[in-house]
Design a protein with these regions (language model features):
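Conserved ATP-binding subdomain of kinase catalytic cores across diverse folds
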Residues: 1-191, 251
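C-terminal catalytic region of ATP-dependent kinase domains
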Residues: 267-415
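Conserved kinase catalytic-core segment
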Residues: 42, 46-49, 53-54, 121, ...
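Active-site-proximal segment of zinc-dependent metalloprotease catalytic domains
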Residues: 189-199, 240-246
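A recognition module on extended beta-rich or small alphabeta surfaces enriched in W/G with H and D/E
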Residues: 166-181, 228, 295-309
Length: 417
């Protein structure tokens, strides 16, 4: 409880990845574990703008990680991971153990772990200022930076009358007794099944039957029409504004329905709530046509709001991760949103532009830096990265915010392209 309200306390994705890596190794999936460790190193390199040796750091982290798994503490964590019982305290202990074993990992681990929480607190605060334009006060989330002794965590207020947006968008396509998580798990089992999976033959047969039922064209058409009817009747206010503002703040894979909620507003219209805003990852202003997969940027949407529907629903913006293994369902969801909400995208882009035009960027960057000041009392913690590196990343993020804040303001008040 914080301020008399129930909150969910979380650590960031980097520590979560350490826990996931332990779980992968407990299942014998060493390559998957190495991949997750690589994500952490990649995050450090991104935040420090290449100022670390990625290959050497990856090797150090991998060696320290597997050495940790051979310790009594590591074996204990692996046993807990087998049953999905790892908690925040556990992943923090894994982090501490790795740094204690190899102090050279203090900065490469500490920077992404620290900025997981700083960036969430700062970016969520910014997005909340926009969400005040269409959400009632009790539906605006928060992400408060917590600094218990020698640690940094995020506390997010629970919104009990909201439901996950991914559940809301997909339920019309699923049998009543099947959750989205169960459907995704079935798809994952089918995809990863070996040709001679005789031991799981019955389970796989059930999974394939479920997927065939979901992907049946009749079911897909019926689900799409049900979603179209719901959206036309009750709307989905804030969807495009949420997608756009998170895009301007540099989000990538976290930009999608699995990081949003939906609630019924006082006017009985559905409202989207953005939660777990990571932010400050990439400069996503420009399109990236040379990527292996084309990626839209936010610049053209700001300059030409009429393009918003196509751009913001493109898979390079609205992630399909929420429907992993259910591509046909995602395709129908996109079609339904496009048909039902085609007149909503452009006005919501204008709302985001007006919000940026009124944004006090200097105050916003000062607020971002103040989050770093909250952590000065933790400088003696063994995992904390060097203060100079923390200031370097704060300056990077402030620069990103300054750049984003300037362009939309020009587009609102200046000549139109």
């Amino acid at each position: 409880m914080l301020d008399g309200q129930e909150h969910l306390v979380k650590t960031g994705i980097s520590r979560s990845l350490l826990g996931q890596a332990v779980a992968c190794c407990a299942k014998g999936q060493v390559e998957k574990a190495t991949k997750r460790l690589g994500y952490i190193v990649g995050s450090a390199a991104r935040l420090l703008e290449g100022a670390i040796d990625k290959q050497a750091t990856q090797q150090r982290l991998t060696l320290a990680f597997h050495a940790f798994l051979d310790t009594e503490k590591g074996k204990e964590m692996a046993e807990k991971a087998k049953t999905g019982a790892l908690d925040i305290d556990d992943v923090c202990r894994i982090h501490d153990s790795l740094v204690a074993a190899d102090p050279r990992l203090r900065n490469p681990l500490g920077i992404p772990i620290l900025f997981d929480v700083i960036n969430v607190a700062a970016a969520q605060d910014l997005v909340n200022a926009l969400q005040e334009r269409y959400l009632s006060r009790q539906h605006i989330p928060d992400s408060s930076l917590l600094t218990p002794p020698s640690n940094a965590l995020i506390a997010s207020r629970l919104i009990h009358d909201a439901q996950p947006l991914d559940t809301f968008l997909t339920k019309a396509f699923l049998p009543p007794e099947v959750s989205l998580a169960q459907a995704k798990q079935a798809a994952a089992r089918v995809e990863s099944a070996a040709p001679d999976s005789g031991a799981q033959a019955d389970e796989l047969a059930e999974d394939r039957a479920l997927l065939a039922r979901i992907n049946d064209p009749v079911n897909l058409r019926a689900g799409k029409q049900a979603l179209v009817d719901t959206l036309r009747h009750n709307g989905l206010d804030g969807l495009f504004a949420s997608l756009l503002v998170r895009l301007t703040l540099g989000e990538a894979s976290d930009l999608g329905p699995d990081n949003m909620l939906v609630v019924s507003g006082e006017d009985a219209r559905h409202k989207v709530i953005s939660i777990d805003v990571t932010g400050f990852r990439y400069d996503r202003e420009q399109d990236a046509p040379s990527d292996p997969r084309f990626r839209h940027g936010w610049g053209d949407v700001i300059r030409a709001p009429a393009s918003a529907l196509d751009v913001l629903l493109h898979k390079s913006v609205m992630s399909d991760r929420y429907a992993t293994g259910l591509k046909s369902v995602h395709a129908m969801v996109i079609q339904a949103i496009g048909e039902a909400l085609d007149g909503q995208a452009t006005p919501e882009v204008e709302m985001v532009k007006q919000w940026y035009a009124a944004l006090d960027v200097d105050s916003a960057t000062a607020s971002l830096r103040s989050l770093g000041d909250q952590l000065k009392g933790m400088s003696a913690a063994g995992w904390m990265p060097d203060a100079a590196l923390v200031n370097q990343v704060l300056a990077r993020n402030s620069s990103l915010l300054n750049h984003v804040g300037a362009c939309p303001r020009f587009c609102v008040t200046g000549p139109q392209a």
